[in-house]
């Protein structure tokens, strides 16, 4: 499966999350997933909340337009971005 899939106006992202990183960044392709490093620890949903906030800024959409479809409790996640206004360059290259 591809790391980034376009579904009409939406994007489906297959992600591998690296929590407790030194900074927030989209690292690149990691196997068949897109690796994203975030600074938040994987405790009490903090990493998921931080990931949603980071992705909403990257795609310039409200936080409500970022949905974690699979992987709430793990590092491997499937996330849907509804009608992104901007697609970061390192993600658009995967389309």
Swiss-Prot record:
One Pfam match: DUF167
Matches recorded under InterPro entries: DUF167 (IPR003746), YggU-like_sf (IPR036591)
Annotated signal peptide: none
Transmembrane intervals: none
Domain of life (superkingdom): Bacteria
Gene3D superfamilies linked: YggU-like
One cellular component (GO) term of this entry: cytoplasm
Assigned protein family: Belongs to the UPF0235 family.
Alphabetical list of PANTHER family matching this protein: UPF0235 PROTEIN C15ORF40
NCBIfam families documented for this protein: DUF167 family protein, PRK05090.1
Protein name in the entry: UPF0235 protein Swoo_1329
Organism: Shewanella woodyi (strain ATCC 51908 / MS32)
């Amino acid at each position: 499966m591809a790391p980034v899939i376009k579904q009409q106006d939406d994007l489906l992202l297959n992600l591998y999350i690296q929590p407790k990183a030194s900074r927030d960044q989209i690292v690149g392709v990691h196997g068949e997933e897109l690796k994203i490093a975030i600074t938040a620890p994987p405790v009490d949903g903090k990493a998921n909340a931080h990931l949603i906030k980071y992705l909403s800024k990257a795609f310039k959409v409200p936080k409500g337009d970022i949905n974690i479809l699979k992987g709430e409790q793990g590092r491997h996640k499937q996330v849907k971005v509804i009608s992104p206004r901007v697609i970061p360059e390192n993600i658009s290259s995967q389309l």
